[in-house]
Structure formats: C-alpha cells, structure tokens
Design a protein with these regions (language model features):
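Alpha-helical elements of Rossmann-like donor-binding domains used by nucleotide-donor carbohydrate transfer enzymes
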Residues: 21, 85, 183, 331-338, ...
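Hydrophobic, well-ordered secondary-structure elements that form the walls
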Residues: 295, 324, 353
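Conserved binding/recognition cores within well-folded domains
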Residues: 381
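Nucleotide-sugar donor-binding catalytic core of glycosyltransferases
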Residues: 2-90, 94-316, 320
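Conserved short C-terminal alpha-helix that flanks the catalytic cleft of nucleotide-sugar-dependent
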Residues: 339-342, 346, 350, 354-364, ...
C-alpha cells in the first residue's frame, strides 16, 4: 500500500481522532496520505497539515479510500449531531482501491450498523464486543496512541519518584456519568483508597493554554489531551480507567441499547430481571476511552474492567495482571490483596503495560495492522 485517501470533515473544530492516529502511523511507515481537505495542523506553520488536499490526487490514484466517522456524523460540544452522507467514491463501480470506514462512535449501535455500511470492504470498529451482534464486515479496532500522547509522556518519572496517587478525574467526557464508572466508584474507589491517595484534580477546560502550540491543539481536539493532564499522569503511579456500561448477557443483539423511548426502557428492565437467572457474565459496552491508552503510555498502573471477561475484543489483547489490572465489582478485594502481597508487582505491571502499548498501539503499529487487515481482504471488483 503506497497511498491512502481520507474523507474528513472540513472543520477545524471537528476532532477526528481516528484520522490523526492512523494517518500519522501511515506516514511513519512510508505511506503517502491525501484527503478531500487539509486536516490536522501539526505545528504553528499554517501549511503543515497531516492530511493534505492535492487537487491532482483523487481516490482513483490511491490504494485505499478511508472514511472517518467524523465525516458522516460529528457531535460538537453542544452535543448536537451533524450528519453527512457516505461519499459516492466509497461505492463507485469499477473502483480499484479498497474502502474502509473508521467507526469510533460511542454506544453499541453506531451508524455503521446501517445496511449501506456493509458495502465497505471493512469497518474498523472500536468498542467492539464479541458477545454482541456485530455486522460481518466490522473488524475489532482500538483508539491507540497519537504522537502527541507519546511525546508528552516520554519523560514520565521513574516509578519510585512518582506520587502514590491514583487518578480518578475524568474530564473531557460526556455531560453524564458512565454507569460503569459510577458502579466502580462505589465498589472500587473506596477500597483502592486504602492503597493509593485518590487524586481528583481536573483541568479547567474553558481556559485555553497560553502556549501557542498547546492552544492550537486545544482548539483542534475540543479541549482534550492537555499538557497539564499528561504531567499529572507522568508523576502518578496509578490510574482508574473504567468506562462504559455493563449490560445484561442477553439478548445477542441488545436493541434496548440502541436509543431511548419506552421500548428501550421496557427492554432493559426485562433483560435486567432475566439476568438474575443467566449465569453468563455481563457485557461491557462503550468501554474504550483515551484514558486507558494514555495511562499505559505514561507507565502508570492501570485499573480497568476485566476486559475479556466482559466480551471486549481488540486486535491484540492485554493480559490481566501483566499489562493492566482488570477487575470486576465482586473481586476488587482479591485484586488489591494480590497487589499488596507482592510489593514489586505494581511497578512490573506498569512497566510491562507501557512496553505492550508501545509495541502494539503506537501509530506505526496500528497502521501496519490496518494495512495488513485491509490487504488480506478480497481485491475490489
């Protein structure tokens, strides 16, 4: 694969995190990147864009045509959705390029569940759960790391010099609390507070940074990924990275997660009642967040849900008590006791987690996985 064409939303405020990570990785492994617009200013040079628009280059000149979820559906900070149709080039008859859709949408039932998305060669879906129905062309994917995350955590303090803090300070998130976080705030946070100091410090997201480059990124990311946040990560030993919702084990296609209304409410109540008699574990929906990847990159001891137990699927899975600590509401005491019994275990897991995420989820690593998966599919007709 030599060239990739991205379809991006031409809006400086529209943070297309999927494009940033993948395009940076593709460029790092020698793949040229073009697009329908200039996207993601990388420096204070107004000509320095990650994705470049060249009117001489069209999708027909490239090996892959990639549509960002930010193109079809973008949600601003007002939490209103702005929709656009799938570009004609995605399904053009006689095309010689492969097509991919990057789906980072929250929730279970994302836009890419619609029938027209089956025409993409592949849909790379974050928040994938193998114990739920997922359309046939969806491929498990991950948010991974951006070069900025790696750079801002590169000088993280050695373990022994860090504060014995656990960060529980979700910031750039939804205007509501994830039910999974609320659950673990009851079952996990009071218990882990006996082992680490709970740090709830947050940034003021309404206050733009003074540094011009930081301000540029502040504006392009809808106020995410601040330098001060990475500094806190880099001097803290542990992070709480719980996210999403633990849904009942049935049904296989949980329609009650597809929206509000009376039908969804009744469906949820029915299957919640049924789950009392269902021995299968619950399923973790919308689990993926930047917090998990950022904390691993910073060399922190990361606490999250027990990912495979709840059905989470990634291109490369982390191993519990090797790369992170995966817990369930009912076994928090056991996990913390295991940590306490081995004084060096927390540091080892943090170190191994950092090495694991750099090996498999750096931009270049994700780009190689993307290219390999896309090229393994049948050639376009």
């Amino acid at each position: 694969m030599k060239r990739v064409y991205f379809q991006c939303r031409d809006n400086r405020r529209a943070y297309q995190d999927d494009v940033v990570v993948l395009a940076e990785g593709l460029r790092a492994i020698g793949v040229e990147v073009f697009g329908n617009c200039n996207y993601w200013q990388r420096s204070l040079d107004p000509r320095d864009y990650l994705v470049r628009h060249d009117p001489r280059i069209t999708p027909d000149d490239c090996d892959a045509f990639v549509v960002s979820y930010g193109w079809t559906r973008w949600m601003d900070t007002d939490f209103k959705s702005y929709l656009q149709p799938i570009p004609e080039a995605a399904f053009r008859a006689g095309r010689r390029y492969r097509t991919a859709y990057l789906d980072y949408e929250d929730g279970y039932h994302s836009g890419s569940f619609a029938p027209e998305y089956r025409r993409f060669d592949a849909v790379f879906r974050t928040k994938y759960n193998e114990r739920c129905f997922q359309p046939a062309n969806q491929i498990p994917w991950a948010m991974g790391l951006s070069p900025r995350m790696i750079a801002y955590t590169a000088d993280a303090l050695p373990w022994a010099e860090r504060a014995r803090d656990i960060l529980v300070n979700f910031n750039a998130s939804h205007p509501y609390v994830h039910s999974g976080r609320a659950l673990m705030d009851r079952h996990f946070t009071p218990k882990v507070a006996r082992h680490f100091r709970v740090n709830t410090d947050r940034d003021n997201l309404k206050e733009a940074p003074a540094d011009p480059l930081d301000r540029l990124f502040f504006e392009q990311t809808q106020q995410r990924h601040s330098r001060s946040f990475y500094a806190r990560l880099s001097r803290s030993q542990a992070v709480s990275a719980f996210c999403g919702e633990l849904a009942p084990a049935a049904p296989f296609e949980p329609y009650y997660l597809q929206g509000g209304g009376r039908r969804a409410r009744y469906g949820r109540k029915f299957f919640e009642a049924l789950s009392v008699f269902d021995p299968r574990p619950r399923r973790l929906i919308q689990w993926d967040s930047w917090r998990f990847w950022e904390a691993l990159a910073a060399g922190c001891l990361v606490f999250n849900f027990d990912l495979p137990h709840y059905g989470v699927k990634l291109p490369v899975m982390p191993e519990n008590f090797v790369h992170y600590i995966g817990v369930r509401p009912e076994n928090v005491d056991d996990a913390l006791a295991r940590l306490a019994a081995d004084p060096g275990l927390a540091e080892r897991i943090a170190r191994q987690g950092r090495a694991w995420v750099m090996e498999h989820y750096s931009p270049a690593a994700l780009a190689r996985t993307f290219v390999r998966r896309l090229e393994s599919l049948p050639a376009p007709c």
